[in-house]
Design a protein with these regions (language model features):
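Core nucleotide-handling region used for phosphoryl-transfer chemistry
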Residues: 1-307
Length: 307
């Protein structure tokens, strides 16, 4: 029943990967990943944070109660729809971005998972489900059908996408949002059709490798991925999950906070940055190997010489 939302990748987007499906570009909201569905066997709505099922006492800042109130007057069609799908979205509570007061404590649906097929549904069906359930959604900035991706100028498409990063009508100061999400218009296999995010510098979870001043290989590789943005992301998750409280965020509680976030911080880097880390290791090896090989071969030349 529980389905954890698949990671949105922060690198590797290639427009050519979507020429058969098309793409959509939507606002990425700075809230808590959450979901809900209807369990027909148990005859109840089940509500989840990113990592666990929620209850009255573990509610993700009121999301559990919000959903129960939201669905209490659902008709038969809406219940049947919710039985087939898990609805994913963002529960908007205060994190880093400052939104208008009226935007908070609302759920913005951004994806629909078909529980029978194990796939995320198409853009068209997703909008139908959202309409049936009367759900709010993040702003959709643009869509490109497959034929448009083939016909339109690639650089203009990419330029238009980049211009959307940070746009928001919900932020207190206009257009100071977190970023955008790019995903396929078609049915999506969680294992083979990832979504991508582009965020503003404020939310970038890595530092440019060229900006680093490494004192050694390990420091260089670790430092590029250890950022305040990534740390804040993990801390906010722990607050949402009630592992930490606002009162815990004090220097006198350093040990508790460190113990709560360290493993998730490490796992997040390993999951999101492993490809880049391996790439940098290979690059480093490629640079250092000649320094070993050259003197070795020079020595062999001397051994074979007459003098």
């Amino acid at each position: 029943m529980y389905k954890k939302y698949d990671k949105i990748l922060n690198k590797g987007f290639q427009l050519s990967d979507f020429v058969e499906t098309g793409i959509e570009v939507t606002e990425k909201l700075d809230g808590s990943n959450a979901s809900f569905t209807y369990d027909a066997d148990a005859k109840k709505v089940r509500v989840f944070s990113r990592n666990q099922e929620l209850t009255e006492n573990n509610s993700l800042n009121g999301f559990y109660q919000y959903v129960q109130e939201f669905v209490k007057d659902f008709n038969d069609l809406q219940i049947a729809t919710l039985s087939d799908y898990t609805i994913f979205g963002e529960w908007l509570t205060k994190h880093t971005v400052t939104y208008k007061d009226e935007a908070y404590n609302k759920f913005y649906a951004f994806d629909v998972f078909n529980k029978k097929s194990g796939y995320y549904v198409s853009h068209r069906l997703r909008l139908e489900v959202f309409s049936t359930l009367q759900l709010k959604t993040p702003e959709e900035f643009m869509t490109f059908e497959p034929d448009e991706l083939l016909i339109l100028n690639k650089e203009k498409i990419l330029s238009g996408i980049k211009e959307c990063v940070g746009k928001s009508n919900l932020t207190l100061i206009p257009n100071t949002g977190e970023g955008i999400v790019i995903k396929s218009l078609g049915v999506r296999d969680p294992d083979n059709n990832p979504s991508y995010k582009l965020v503003t510098d404020r939310f970038r979870e890595t530092k440019g490798l060229k900006q680093q001043k490494p004192t050694g290989l390990q420091v260089h590789l670790v430092d590029y991925a250890i950022t305040e943005a990534r740390m804040k992301k993990i801390i906010f998750k722990k607050l949402d999950e009630q592992v930490l409280t606002e009162e815990d965020l004090s220097l006198q509680n350093f040990g508790k906070v460190m113990g709560s976030v360290a493993k998730d911080f490490q796992d997040d880097i390993i999951e999101e940055e492993m490809d880049e880390i391996i790439k940098q290791i290979r690059k480093r090896i490629g640079k250092q190997l000649p320094n070993l090989l050259r003197p070795f071969l020079e020595e062999k030349d001397r051994e074979m010489g007459d003098l």
